[in-house]
Design a protein with these regions (language model features):
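Bacterial N-terminal signal peptides
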Residues: 10-20
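Mid-to-C-terminal alpha-helical segments outside catalytic/metal-binding sites
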Residues: 275-276, 280-309
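Short acidic/histidine-rich active-site segments
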Residues: 231, 254-271
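Acidic (Asp/Glu)-rich catalytic clusters
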Residues: 34, 86-95, 118-125, 169, ...
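Catalytic pocket-lining loop regions of alpha/beta-barrel enzymes
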Residues: 169, 176-240, 258
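Extended substrate/RNA-proximal surfaces in nucleic-acid metabolism proteins
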Residues: 96, 109-204
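Histidine/acidic-residue-rich catalytic or RNA/ligand-binding cores of hydrolases
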Residues: 51-55, 83-85, 143, 188-194, ...
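An N-terminally biased module of ancient metal coordination in phosphate/nucleic-acid-related enzymes
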Residues: 26-96
């Protein structure tokens, strides 16, 4: 399905703002029957403090995940590093692995290899992920953002900018996970071989449907052993359907996907609630327990360097 800039703008506004009024609780123990969250790993957790309204703090998100039996969460913030926050949360919450990373938006200097190096050096060793630009990505700004807004280029005339290659080298040196942010499918397909050439071992295509990747483009990404994220928020706000996801899973293979929530927006369900609904919807759509386990536990654990579940 082709997406117009207007459609894409609506999609990402929904992703950023969320659906108001779904839940006002700040921290609850989810006690729904049927869908165990034991061992689940969420690679897309938003929480506060943030410059955007969030439903929970880092600590509240971590406590909720631990109480639900989840194995690990990855804290994501579009404008500041989260490795330090993950370390602080780890000191307060038992029974849960908590990781962070850095998004290479303008707030940290854009394509800034030094931001990645400093993240790695922070005490606690919780920095595991580098995201290419998200809200400041060229594709995002031109298709979704405000007219004339600044963006961070990762390619020029079809060639990666030098800073991107240096970032890839730092990612490879420290065996980090590279996530593609809001890069276009064409940029992702061009950059994956460059990252692998420089030694990057693990690549995550950030919510692959949201940037409008076609099925053939997804197959190209899979052929390079990239893992593609499919998030619950896009289904929750109606921009994607479970059928979109299940068709791709059945055609390409569950081994190339990870499920995540991308929740944390004020007014949206809490992360464990999202997981219960997401897993239930996948089961109802005919996805096998084994494939759900692969996409919600095994694949994301491997991407974070954890032992297989």
């Amino acid at each position: 399905m082709l997406s117009t800039p207007r459609t894409l703008k609506c999609l990402f506004v929904c992703l950023a703002v969320g659906i108001a009024g779904v839940s006002s609780a700040r921290h609850v123990r989810v006690q729904e029957e049927g869908e165990s969250l034991d061992g689940v790993v969420d690679l897309h957790v938003h929480a506060g403090p943030d410059s955007r309204p969030r439903s929970v703090s880092d600590l509240e998100a971590a406590r909720g995940a631990a109480e639900a039996g989840m194995r690990a969460i990855l804290l994501k913030n579009h404008f500041t590093m989260t490795a330090d926050r993950a370390s602080l949360a780890m000191d307060q919450v038992e029974g849960l692995e908590i990781f962070g990373g850095v998004v290479l938006n303008r707030a940290v200097g854009g394509i800034n290899p030094e931001a990645v190096r400093q993240m790695v050096e922070f005490s606690g060793n919780r920095g595991r992920v580098v995201w290419l630009p998200t809200f400041d990505a060229e594709w995002y700004v031109k298709n979704v953002g405000e007219d004339g807004a600044e963006f961070v280029s990762i390619m020029q005339e079809g060639i990666p900018v030098p800073g991107v290659l240096e970032v890839f080298s730092v990612v490879a040196e420290h065996n980090l996970l590279l996530a593609t942010g809001h890069s276009s499918p064409e940029e992702v397909i061009a950059l994956i071989p460059e990252a692998k050439r420089l030694g990057v071992q693990r690549i995550l295509v950030t919510h692959v449907f949201s940037q409008g990747a076609t099925r053939e483009q997804m197959k190209q990404m899979a052929s390079e052993n990239a893992i593609m994220e499919i998030d619950w928020l896009a289904v929750l706000n109606g921009s994607r359907s479970i059928t979109d996801y299940t068709m791709a899973i059945q055609e390409i293979g569950a081994e190339f996907f990870v499920m995540s929530t991308d929740l944390g927006q004020a007014g949206n369900p809490l992360h464990p609630e999202g997981w219960h609904a997401y897993i239930g919807a996948m089961r109802e759509a005919g996805i096998s327990p084994g494939d759900i386990n692969m996409m919600s536990r095994r694949n994301p654990a491997r991407l974070l360097g954890l032992d297989p579940w």
